[in-house]
Amino acid sequence: MDAITINSLFLVGAVLVAASILLSSFSSRLGIPILVIFLAIGMLAGTDGLGGIAFDNYPAAYLVSNLALAVILLDGGMRTRASSFRVALWPALSLATFGVIITAGLTGLVAAWLFNLDIIQGLLIGAIIGSTDAAAVFSLLGGKGLNERVSATLEIESGSNDPMAVFLTVTLIAMIAAGETSLSWMFLVHLIQQFGLGIIIGLLGGGLLLLLINRMELANGLYPLLAVSGGILVFALATALNGSGILAVYLCGLLLGNRPIRNRAGILQTFDGLAWLSQIGMFLVLGLLLNPSDLLPIAIPALLLSLWMILFARPLSVFIGLLPFRSFNLRERVFISWVGLRGAVPVILAVFPMMAGLPNANLFFNVAFFVVLVSLLLQGTTLSFAARKAKLVVPPTLAPVSRIGLDIDMNNQWEQFIYQLSCDKWCIGATLRDLKMPQGTRIAALFRGKDLLHPTGSTRLKEGDILCVIGQEHDLPALGKLFSQSPNIQLDERFFGDFILDADAKLQDISQIYGLNLEPTVDKQQTLGQFVLYLFGGEPVIGDQIEWDGLTWTIAEMESDRVSRVGVKIVTDKA
């Protein structure tokens, strides 16, 4: 490769990445998932597009995609709160194992019939497209404001279901290559190996990386590089030992993100940029790899297969997988069924048969790509609408304009939150002493126009003021409500109820006020929060609703595992 070729690659790569970034702003305006934008730019630059770039290097695409996935999952793991496992771990694992098997099996049987393949080849197609994609789920769920049970289940499922899909794909490829037509006991051994080694290497590697980061004295800019290189090492080691690198790197990130770690803010900020670059690079490469003209001959059967998987196989697998978990209501189950987003992972798995030289490998690849396109366009574009229809969007609290980590104490993560007060904020005109600031937070600075003011208790807030607040991550919900817009209060009332009650109130007092018909066996001395927990069962989350005794009871606030506020609304009969 000469210097001119190398420079041309730099030029083309820079133009494609810049175009992806600039055109990403159209995603929200057009209601198209941003990943589709990246994919479309890659396809336009490819052989059948305006760019005419001939790219069919499957090993290179496999390399780029796996590297990108490792970075995306490391970042996703760091941003997943361990507290979400309280409500979602076991349901997500059920979907990540039994759910994938059911989806792959049902989809594979129909694929064999539609494309006139034998059963094993059909099941291989089912295995390739059987898992949801972490990159797509993390990207499309971000900022949707879903209740914690649903969002955590979908995120943990997408981060942990790839081992099952990889295991099924690799096993079926080996069977086809060896001419086998039935399953053997090695099927179970490979499954245990994928999950077991992925978990062990991910947790051990994450623990060692955490220890190394906290022990080393480095320049601040080197900590993120150490973290990402360590995560890729964990991914590569698990994969080399025939474990799940995807699960390992996700668990590594989860451990780093939920333990005290040096320069946490700097690591997260760097990871944010790396994750975006990884998504852009991965979908550009996959778009270049695809020739849209190859999809036309299979369009009708591939569309039928996509609809079968989306409308039947995925919902059935979700309803079966969530049968033991009564905390999920019907609306949540239906929504989880709909968010079976496919993305880069099925396309990467479809490269496996190409590299193994299997017959019909091109067909497997094109079908997988077609299913991914249908999933992103159909499910991805309707995600917000489906969430609203299912009434799973919890009224958001105001997020700061920006947040900056203060690397003062590794065990006590202080941050600076920046809030800008527009005219619709209810606190405009209030004095600082009137604000009920969360305990332990401080207003460090107040900017008015170009001037830095010295805030005192008598300082009145005005439109356009910029507040710099020192606090910690757990203070964000209270600060968000403090600086929220007035319309959000009305939204809270519509969603949570006509009245919001303190959960520490005695049930006996509440029953007298609202005329509740309590059964004799109910302890009237318990608190409202304890009684609501009894009504819901399982692990409640903010936004959970239940109708009882002519009233709708909604969990409005929680502190750790404890219900702190409950919304009450009178049930009205709809004509």
From Swiss-Prot:
Main location: membrane
Domain named RCK C-terminal: residues: 403-485
Transmembrane segments: 3-23, 30-50, 58-78, 95-115, 122-142, 172-192, 194-214, 221-241, 244-261, 270-290, 293-313, 334-354, 363-383
Bilayer disposition of the protein: Multi-pass membrane protein
Organism domain of life: Bacteria
N-terminal signal peptide: none
Known role: K(+)/H(+) antiporter that extrudes potassium in exchange for external protons and maintains the internal concentration of potassium under toxic levels.
Similarity-based family: Belongs to the monovalent cation:proton antiporter 1 (CPA1) transporter (TC 2.A.36) family. NhaP2 subfamily.
NCBIfam families noted in UniProt: PRK05326.1-1, PRK05326.1-2, PRK05326.1-3
Protein name per the record: K(+)/H(+) antiporter NhaP2
Annotated source species: Yersinia pseudotuberculosis serotype O:1b (strain IP 31758)
Lineage: Bacteria, Pseudomonadati, Pseudomonadota, Gammaproteobacteria, Enterobacterales
Name of the encoding gene: nhaP2
